[in-house]
Amino acid sequence: MPAIFPVTGAQAAGNLATTSSYSGTFIPAVWSAKLAEKFYAASVYGEIANTSWQGEVSSMGDKVYINTAPTIQIANYQAGMNLTYQVPTPDMQELVIDKGRYFAFQINDVLEYQAKPNLMDMFAADAAEQMRIAIDSNVVYNTFSGGAAANKGATAGVKSSSYNLGTDAAPVALTGANVLTKILELASVLDEQNVPESDRYLVIDPATRTLLMQSNLAQAQFMGDATSPVRNGKIGTIDRFTVYVTNQLPKAAAGTATPWISGDGAENTVTSTGSVLKRRAIIAGHKSAITFASQITKMETVRNPNDFGDFIRSLNVYGFKVVKPESLALLIAA
């Protein structure tokens, strides 16, 4: 639909619009709730990480102190013996909310009046999707290799050392014939660490999902969940793992000298345009492995002093930490 009111210069190229019911009567709480809901429907790490401390975050720079239950010792008993009492000391870890992402855009009253469909919904959906991509990529890039040494490499398994989960120099070549076997080996590695069977997850890339669907055994064990939100990447279960598919897993070119690249390409980008990505990360773990806290701390509007319209801006702060490395495993695939 052509503009009824003429739009010139930078306004035609850059000014955006919103619904009239929100122009001049902006309600921050309404917008904040909407964005948070859409973000967590789309975020892999909102699903697989421990978010128990989410409500304690109020601003960037906050510190959340996490107490981990100590291990209670079990001793032999003989009749008449004096008991030795243990003094349990919780292990305290510090989660720093030191990351922040924002968006800011301009809404023009005249363009909003002509806009169809509802632009607030459209902008909120796009902001949530872009936030998902940025935060998911950042979190997974900085945690994917944070598991225990016994949970990765060519001799994985804290007790058996018998599972080849790949290395930078020698990634595992996945095929339709062996992909399920490697997933079962990831499960065994977690079993050897006594990781609980519930709340386990597996995060794979689309190429690995394709290999899974080419495996007859995988198809027999793979159960879709028609009621799950599509945009969180959840596609089914395999051997106690809830399986998620995402494009945000790190990748790297062949060889140990080349850096890993974040899923969105924003971190450690390879400068050579001729690099061929030959390594990819596949992550398995338990919900307790990574603590992740995110909060939309600012959502506000300011009237544009130079035009009829509003400036809308929002700040999302977050932090993450691998708190149980024994509950996180890594497969380096090719």
PLM feature spans:
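Residue-level detector of alpha-helical recognition elements and their boundaries
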Residues: 81, 141-142, 146, 258, ...
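Structured, hydrophobic secondary-structure cores that serve as assembly/anchoring elements
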Residues: 60-65, 71, 84, 91-121, ...
